[in-house]
From Swiss-Prot:
Protein name, as recorded: Small ribosomal subunit protein uS14c
Similarity section: Belongs to the universal ribosomal protein uS14 family.
Gene that this polypeptide is encoded by: rps14
Organism, scientific name: Cuscuta exaltata
Main localisation: plastid
Oligomeric form and interacting partners: Part of the 30S ribosomal subunit.
Length: 100
């Protein structure tokens, strides 16, 4: 189980990212549209003034049961060992253990 403070910090980052998502996206599009370098610098300053944690690269994909940040499977939203346990207990429909 991950520390609760880390999980809360990640949730706070997700909220910030949602809040600034449109602003960051429109600024980046505007950079490519504006031909003058001086105007581009103004837009860059505007982008850099947004909070650091509002960038999507600061987010971690975490297991929604344990909060573990590593070995996550996107399709299920689970970490590897929880996924394995759930497949063995037949709790995930359509998932089978491989055997060869």
């Amino acid at each position: 189980m991950a520390r609760k403070s880390l999980i809360q910090r990640n949730k706070k980052r997700q909220k910030l990212e949602l809040k600034y998502h449109w602003i960051r996206g429109s600024s980046k599009k505007e950079i490519h549209r504006v031909p003058l370098l001086s105007d581009k610098w103004e837009i860059y300053v505007k982008l850099q003034s947004s909070p650091r944690n509002s960038a999507p690269t600061r987010l971690h994909r975490r297991c929604f049961l344990t909060g573990r940040p590593r070995a996550n499977y996107r399709d299920f939203g689970l970490s590897g060992h929880i996924l394995r346990e759930m497949v063995q207990a037949c709790l995930l429909p359509g998932a089978t253990r491989s055997s060869w």
